[in-house]
A protein has these predicted regions:
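Short, charged, surface-exposed secondary-structure boundary motifs
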Residues: 18, 36-37, 119, 230-232, ...
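Histidine-rich, glycine-flanked metal-binding segment
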Residues: 1-34
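Metal-associated gating/positioning segment near the N- to mid-region
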Residues: 28-87, 92-95
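Glycine-enriched alpha-helix->loop->beta-strand junction motifs that scaffold or abut catalytic
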Residues: 211-218, 235-242, 271-273
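Catalytic beta/alpha-barrel core
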Residues: 195-199, 218-226, 246, 250-251
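Polyanionic/metal-chelating signatures
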Residues: 87-218
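His/Asp/Glu-enriched, well-ordered alpha-helical/loop segment
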Residues: 50, 55-61, 67, 193, ...
Length: 339
């Protein structure tokens, strides 16, 4: 590669290069060359120390915050980032948290001193969090019973009303500016993706229908534990899934204990584009475990090459950066490593 771009991908046994063709030659005999792994839906660089409030920038106050841009709060020289790169994590989608509409994420490469030089794709999508259909009472030491969320339909309609009002504003001729609704423009003109954070089947179906009714075409499900139940709808609308952390327990007591480990293969076999994400407890430091999540998918039946794509090319496609990275191809960024 030269100037950060891959210039040649070929079989070394079939071609011969001049010794001075490249400034540096690396002997990788017996090793593998991998495209950089991508961790989506990440808060890397947004929080340094959980107990120090001044270093926590992952969440903004308010319910509808599409105008919140995570990239301006991203700390490129975070000490946590230094611990994930040795495991091949070279890119991340920096994603805000909280509210119904959390804000806009951006995609960065992790070898930088400032967010501007780290940028791969700015404001790639807007993230919404759908309300749960069921809730458990009590607290962690004394869990209560599971009960239906009586406010579910009302909360869903609030999201729907927000998008309808945003669309109306963008199509109007008002002289007054509304920065909150202006921030949703990319969803309606196709330049941004709507990332719907949902695990339950009803959440997923309702979220997709809500988006389609408002003219939003580029959709990705984040979490998607029960996405396999909505596979026909996902396939019909070309919607992929950033699958929740698979090193976890099932969400329901009557589910197969190994279901989280099998989920990537189940969705892949159904023809759904799947990537892996790692949000949850200790998500920033445990981002380094992303390749092990892919390894678990292999142990539960997925082909090794397809498992690798879960954290490289598939994720790049879901984030809209596959023309730039995600695989080893001529013309793409030389964001890679040898192991």
């Amino acid at each position: 590669f030269k100037d950060g771009k891959i210039t040649l991908v070929a079989n070394a046994q079939q071609i011969k290069l001049a010794k001075d063709a490249y400034n540096t030659t690396i002997d990788a005999t017996g090793k593998h060359v991998y495209p950089g792994f991508i961790v989506p839906n990440s808060t890397l660089g947004l929080v340094e120390i959980d107990a120090v409030k001044s270093s926590d920038d992952e969440e903004e106050i308010g319910t509808f915050n599409p105008n919140v841009r995570s990239i301006v709060a991203y700390t490129a020289d975070s000490k946590v980032i230094e611990t994930v790169r040795p495991n091949g994590i070279l890119m991340a989608q920096i994603t805000p948290r909280g509210g119904r509409v959390s804000g806009s994420s951006s995609i960065v490469q992790l070898d930088a001193w400032h967010w501007k030089e780290a940028l791969i794709k700015e404001n790639d999508g807007i993230h919404i969090n759908l309300p749960a259909t069921f809730r458990r009472g009590g607290w962690w030491a004394e869990p209560g019973s599971i009960e239906p969320n009586k406010e579910y339909n009302k909360q869903l309609q609030e999201i729907n009303a927000f998008f309808k009002s945003s669309k109306a504003y963008l199509g109007g001729t008002s002289d007054s500016r509304n920065l909150v609704t202006e921030a949703t423009k990319g969803l309606f003109d196709g330049t941004q993706t709507l990332f719907i954070h949902a695990d339950e089947e009803k959440q997923i179906v309702d979220g997709i229908q809500l988006a389609l009714e408002n003219g939003i075409k580029k959709i990705v499900i984040v979490g998607g534990f029960e996405a396999y139940k909505a596979a026909p709808l996902l396939l019909k609308n070309n919607i992929g899934v950033l699958l929740r952390r698979i090193h976890d327990l099932p969400t329901n007591e009557d589910q197969d204990i190994d279901l989280p480990y099998k989920m990537a293969k189940i969705l892949t076999d159904k023809g759904i584009l799947v990537g892996l994400e790692n949000s949850g407890s200790k998500e920033r430091m445990s981002s380094r475990n992303l390749p092990f999540l892919a390894g678990t998918c292999v142990a539960y039946g997925l082909d090794k090459e397809k498992a690798l794509q879960l954290i490289t090319l598939n994720t790049a496609k879901l984030l809209g950066i596959d023309q730039q990275c995600g695989s080893l191809e001529e013309g793409k960024d030389a964001t890679l490593f040898i192991s």
